[in-house]
């Protein structure tokens, strides 16, 4: 019956996973109403919530999945959560949260200690030269001037953002991680939890020894092959099968996952839904692999790439095999409102050459990359009847962006006029490139100044020899090349008519001289028979024999 735990004949100390999905859902729903989203920041004011089917004293690990606030109240749970964040390279979030907790406990009258702790927190987590910077948005940035008048709640907004980031992002992955599943299984079997950071669960002294059997005897039904612990007992007193225990474990975990998915995800912090969906699918495949006894390769955590965005913030991207760098960054750029074609990707420390986005993203595992935004606009060259695409850094001015195209055509800034289509007023070349992003500009020249390519067209182009032009355009970016090809086809009427007769004569001449060898052309006039092959009458200096 919903609302009461199913005892199943399990002893009091082992009733960790014997709970139905409906109980977890109802408990989570009532708890969600009692706990405000991100409203309780201090660990001393975290709500206790309604009664839980898990006793926090006897089953503390199972209670960690109830809520993020309950996890923070347990020192052991907070230590395991910190260890999990270290593996994800984001331990600075929980470290910053704990530092803010200690800072709020300082009395407001103790201005000296407040100033010292505020200085330490700011320069370690919030300044532009911080050793462990946290990921907060621009609205929560603080200047160093606020340290002159410290208050116990001066970091409340920043702590709230990090709290929401951990609650709706990191905590969701923690309850699905193999680390939490190990702790949950150890508690279900009665084994002591290992210390966070060690490699084995339980100590060798406290672990039970394998039962010794007499000759001819076998282990009873339900006891694991390694003989560490007997399994939970069923209603008839017989131990439950290992597969049934796994089903109970999976059921409790699925209940916790469903409860987490029912919560609100409208957080002010960054939350990559596509990334969470992938983590959920990885957790599901890991659970299935445990149930079927397959390899443990699915449970291995993937490697991440640290991505520094143009606005100064950072994000973690999972480097999955089989995905390109373009696919890995597509979700981050879409979430931040960035156009991926206008982004250049550089390795931190090697910013001379941009990375190719079509290679496998596993090359960036455990690496740091920096994204630089590029401003693109189209420039219509009136003298050439051509449209080119220009990409430049946002910090550049218009005259700096136009310098390469002007140098290519042999022009200077004094000989051109830049304006928008339909306007005659020239634009100020000192304006930044960001002011003309995604626009089309017109580059006009006075009548006395002509572009070099418009004045001196190569004979090959005037005769319509397209292979050389295509070879030149093939080195340009695809967008530029396509634009150039379109302009070339649109200006066909300005070209000179090809000499068809001369072209036919040239083709005939090429066909007639098609047979070559190393000695030259093989023509009939050039064929000379060797002397030993000639007839006696054809040999030079030969006389006819008398009749």
UniProtKB/Swiss-Prot annotation:
Changing residue 519 to F: Reduces interaction with GNAI1 and GNAI2. Inhibits strongly the down-regulation of G(i)-dependent signaling. Residues 500-522 form the GoLoco domain. The modification Phosphothreonine is found at residue 249. Residues 67-184 form the RGS domain. Residues 476-491 have a biased composition (Low complexity). The keyword Phosphoprotein applies. Residues 300-427 are annotated as: Necessary for interaction with RABGEF1. It is found in: Nucleus; Nucleus, PML body; Cytoplasm; Membrane. One of its GO terms (biological process) is response to oxidative stress. Residues 303-374, 376-446 form the RBD domain. Its main location: nucleus. Residues 19-59, 191-220, 447-496 are annotated as: Disordered. Residues 23-58 have a biased composition (Polar residues). It comes from the Eukaryota. Phosphorylated by PKC. Phosphorylation is increased in presence of forskolin and may enhance the GDI activity on G(i) alpha subunit GNAI1. Disruption phenotype: No visible phenotype. Mice show an enhancement of postsynaptic long-term potentiation (LTP) responses in the CA2 neurons of the hippocampus that is correlated with an increase of spatial learning and object recognition memory (OMR). Regulates G protein-coupled receptor signaling cascades. Inhibits signal transduction by increasing the GTPase activity of G protein alpha subunits, thereby driving them into their inactive GDP-bound form. Besides, modulates signal transduction via G protein alpha subunits by functioning as a GDP-dissociation inhibitor (GDI). Has GDI activity on G(i) alpha subunits GNAI1 and GNAI3, but not on GNAI2 and G(o)-alpha subunit GNAO1. Has GAP activity on GNAI0, GNAI2 and GNAI3. May act as a scaffold integrating G protein and Ras/Raf MAPkinase signaling pathways. The RGS domain is necessary for GTPase-activating protein (GAP) activity for G subunits and localization to the nucleus and centrosomes. Interacts with GNAI1 and GNAI2. Interacts with GNAI3. Interacts with GNAO1. Interacts (via RGS and GoLoco domains) with GNAI1; the interaction occurs in the centrosomes. Interaction with GNAI1 or GNAI3 (via active GTP- or inactive GDP-bound forms) prevents association of RGS14 with centrosomes or nuclear localization. Interacts with RABGEF1; the interactions is GTP-dependent. Interacts with RAP2A; the interactions is GTP-dependent and does not alter its function on G(i) alpha subunits either as GAP or as GDI. Associates with microtubules. This is Regulator of G-protein signaling 14. It comes from Mus musculus. The lineage of its organism: Eukaryota, Metazoa, Chordata, Craniata, Vertebrata.
């Amino acid at each position: 019956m919903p609302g009461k735990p199913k005892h199943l004949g399990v002893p009091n100390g082992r009733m960790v996973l014997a709970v139905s999905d409906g109980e977890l859902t109802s408990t989570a729903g009532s708890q969600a109403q009692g706990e405000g989203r991100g409203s309780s920041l201090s660990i001393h004011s975290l709500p206790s919530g309604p009664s839980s089917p898990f006793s926090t004293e006897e089953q503390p690990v199972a209670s960690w999945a109830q809520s993020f606030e309950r996890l923070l109240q347990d020192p052991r749970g907070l230590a395991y959560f910190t260890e999990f964040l270290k593996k994800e390279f984001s331990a600075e979030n929980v470290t910053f949260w704990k530092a803010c907790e200690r800072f709020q406990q300082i009395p407001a009258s103790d201005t000296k200690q407040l100033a010292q702790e505020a200085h330490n927190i700011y320069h370690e987590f919030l300044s532009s030269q911080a050793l462990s910077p946290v990921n907060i948005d621009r609205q929560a940035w603080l200047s160093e001037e606020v340290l002159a008048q410290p208050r116990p709640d001066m970091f409340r907004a920043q702590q709230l953002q990090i709290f929401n980031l951990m609650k709706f992002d990191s905590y969701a992955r923690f309850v699905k991680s193999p680390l939490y599943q190990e702790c949950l299984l150890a508690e279900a079997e009665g084994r002591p939890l290992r210390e966070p950071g060690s490699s084995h669960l339980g100590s060798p002294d406290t672990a039970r020894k394998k039962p010794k059997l007499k000759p001819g005897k076998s282990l009873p039904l339900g006891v694991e092959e390694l003989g560490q612990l007997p399994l939970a007992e069923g209603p008839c007193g017989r131990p439950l099968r290992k597969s049934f225990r796994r089903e109970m474990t999976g059921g409790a975990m699925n209940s916790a996952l469903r409860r987490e998915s029912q919560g609100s995800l409208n957080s002010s912090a960054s939350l990559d839904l596509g990334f969470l969906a992938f983590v959920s699918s990885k957790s599901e495949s890991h659970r299935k692999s445990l149930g079927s006894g397959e390899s443990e390769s699915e449970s291995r955590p993937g490697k991440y790439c640290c991505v520094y965005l143009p606005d100064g913030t950072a994000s973690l991207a999972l480097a999955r095999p089989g995905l390109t760098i373009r696919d890995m960054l597509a979700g981050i750029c879409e979430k931040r409102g960035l156009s991926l074609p206008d982004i250049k990707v550089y390795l931190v420390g090697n910013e001379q050459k941009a990375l190719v986005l079509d290679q496998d993203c596993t090359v960036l595992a455990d690496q740091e990359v920096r994204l630089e935004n590029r401003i693109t606009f189209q420039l219509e060259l009136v003298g050439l009847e051509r449209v080119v695409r220009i990409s430049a850094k946002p910090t550049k001015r218009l005259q700096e962006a136009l310098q390469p195209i002007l140098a290519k055509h042999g022009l200077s800034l004094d000989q051109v006029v830049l304006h928008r289509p339909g306007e005659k007023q020239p634009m100020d070349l000192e304006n930044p490139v960001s002011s003309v992003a995604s626009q089309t500009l017109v580059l006009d020249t006075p009548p006395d100044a002509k572009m070099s390519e418009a004045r001196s067209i190569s004979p090959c182009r005037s005769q319509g020899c397209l292979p050389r032009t295509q070879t030149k355009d093939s080195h340009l970016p695809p967008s530029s090349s396509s634009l150039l090809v379109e302009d070339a086809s649109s200006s066909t009427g300005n070209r000179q008519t090809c000499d068809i007769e001369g072209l036919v004569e040239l083709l005939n001449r090429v066909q007639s001289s098609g047979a070559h060898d190393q000695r030259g052309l093989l023509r009939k006039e050039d064929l000379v028979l060797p002397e030993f092959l000639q007839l006696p009458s054809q040999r030079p200096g030969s006389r006819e024999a008398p009749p």
